[in-house]
Amino acid sequence: MQVSSVNNVKIYNLSHGKSLPEWLSDRKKRVLQKKDVDIQRRIELIQDFEMPTVCTSIRVSRDGQYILAAGTYKPRVRCYDTYQLSLKFERCLDSDVVTFDILSDDYSKLVFLHIDRYVEFHSQHGHYYKTRIPKFGRDFSYHSPSCDLYFVGASSEVFRLNLEQGRFLNSLQTDAAEMNVCDINPVHQLFAAGTLEGRVDCWDPRVRTRVAALDCALSSITDNTEVEGLPSVSALKFNDSLGLAVGTSTGQILVYDLRSSRPLLVKDHYYGLPIKSLHFHNSLDLVLSADSKIIKMWNKDNGKVFSSIEPQANINDVCLYPASGMLFTANEDPKMNTFYIPALGPAPRWCSFLDNLTEELEENPESTIYDDYKFVTRKDLESLGLAHLIGSPLLRAYMHGFFMDIRLYHKVKTMVNPFAYEEYRKDKIRQKIEESRAQRVQLKKLPKVNKELALKLMEEDTELTNKKKKKKANVAGNLLMDDRFKVMFENPDYQVDERSEEFRLLNPIISNVAERRRKSLLEEEQEQAEEEQEPEGRGSSEDDSSDEDDKGWVQEVREQRRLLRMEERERSYIQRQERRQQDRNTRLQSSDTHTQQSHGAQKPRFYQIKSGEEFRSFSDVSRKQKTHKASLEERLQRLEKSDTLSLNDTAVGSKQLTFTLKKTEKQRFQQQAERDHHEERRRIRRSAGHLHSNRGGGRGRGGGRGRGGGRGRGGGRGRRPF
């Protein structure tokens, strides 16, 4: 038996353990059972609860006494009696079974749908009748009031076979190309069929007409689902009279209320595998949905996960035993799994001893230890020289390493390192000595990085003498021991630069907060020491003191800013002096090279101007080179001197930069030339105010522009004579 806990829900796998092969004789099986301890300790709840190769589907009779399973190879059906906990009978079939159903309360009436379109009926004694449907079938449902079997498959029709009359009835015509699953509501007998296009068609068996259609493919696409391709319906299950769960081929489950066309909840398995089975657990309001990889149990109202089961083999079918916490799975494996979940319900009455067994296991939990095997990684194998054994039966791959026999491991370890025991003994002695040293009185050692911060934290920790306050301020005391902040006192990259501008501007605020905290601690100690209450009006004094503290740290911030500006001026002055000295040196060097060249042969030298630059003179070359080589800080300082840049510091350490764009020399020259031109025109302009005539008053000879006084020959715009 294997015990696992998923989401704090205990799950017992009763089929876990070694199984004996079928080809062994009974005598050899008995011998193995006597010799092998693991086989003796295993729990075989139902004898021979397995198939030769694969189990495809599994069902429980209505009375709960019989468990029937269909599988291969060869195709067969097996019936197990729970009262006897053993196999009751086995019947071989002609072809593989797609699905089957139990029509009676016990095993006396069975219907099998085969992959070759045959429908086979079995009675209590065995095979009873066999017929064939027109198309390949995928699922069927039994309508008990009319004794009709509804078959769906690779066709747009729903075939009806009446078991009372023994003949086929008129089929139900649908718009779908193919249909995958079907189900009948146990309360009002509504028939529902899931189509290949992702639609669910609902029919009323009384009138044989479609009453509703649900588009599940479109509803399965939400923000929380991962849908790849067109979803088709792969599972259907009714719950009571109004509940319906639909499973899609892309791994989504849609929970519907039949009164609405929109799903109440959309749940995604996130595996992208078709949903194969759906079951409702009404006592806990759970839905059990299964694909080929996992069985998930979740709340039908909010989708919250209750637990999950992930068998080792792929799942073909799931059957929930009624009114209990037991379920069976048909797998791609000879063994059929039996799971018991006490949180879902009690054990069935035919195996009530499971409740006592699980209670004993919970009282005495045991950890799983592999005493006979040693887990080694690939690096360990290389150090032992056993890398060549990878892939051999001596190593069993598991996760990121391998399991090997513990005896082989000890032998190889002794051969590789014969002095391993001596080293182990020395390590143990060293550990004992270190433990004894830890009990001595130890001096506080400061870390290599941020010593002042560590010293400050230690001082604050020593000031907290009261135990209650020490609990409240436990963060400051344990900061040096906390692994999250351990790097801050070991890595030099985290060293606090106290000479930086940001630290000097923020330090007054931090020191003020620390001072306030220290004062508050002292006041609390005084309050606890005093027996009488303090007089009224203390709040105003605290406010006054806080205002004075605020004024104090504001003045300190201003003083720090003033000191920073003075230091900046001094640095800029020193840099200017250094640049002047460099300029003098470069001029002397250029003059020396000029004299050396004058004594030598005079040869012409050619210079190539770079593209995008304007050549003015050779004297600007050195200045340009200095400008290009200068750092960003030096360029900003030059701009600040020329009044085109202003740099201000705020109280919290940030900077404010304001700059103005200068006009180019060419633009200034053009503007100055225009101003000179206008001034010159103004100076040479002659006034014509002294030139006037008494005839007319206009611009011409008359009073206007012409000879008259108007614009022509008459009086016009000019002034008339008085």
UniProtKB/Swiss-Prot annotation:
It is found in: Nucleus, Nucleolus. The gene is nol10. InterPro entries: Beta-prop_NOL10_N (IPR056551), NOL10/Enp2 (IPR040382), NOL10_2nd (IPR056550), NUC153 (IPR012580), Quinoprotein_ADH-like_sf (IPR011047), WD40/YVTN_repeat-like_dom_sf (IPR015943), WD40_rpt (IPR001680). Keywords: Coiled coil, Nucleus, Repeat, WD repeat. Belongs to the WD repeat NOL10/ENP2 family. It comes from the Eukaryota. GO terms for cellular component: nucleolus; small-subunit processome. Residues 523-534 have a biased composition (Acidic residues). WD repeats lie at residues 50-90, 174-213, 228-266, 270-308, 310-349. Residues 683-693, 702-722 have a biased composition (Basic residues). The keyword Iron-sulfur does not apply. Residues 423-476, 511-534, 620-681 form a coiled coil. GO terms for biological process: maturation of SSU-rRNA from tricistronic rRNA transcript (SSU-rRNA, 5.8S rRNA, LSU-rRNA). Residues 521-555, 572-607, 616-635, 664-722 are annotated as: Disordered. Residues 572-586, 664-682 have a biased composition (Basic and acidic residues). This is Nucleolar protein 10. Residues 587-600 have a biased composition (Polar residues).
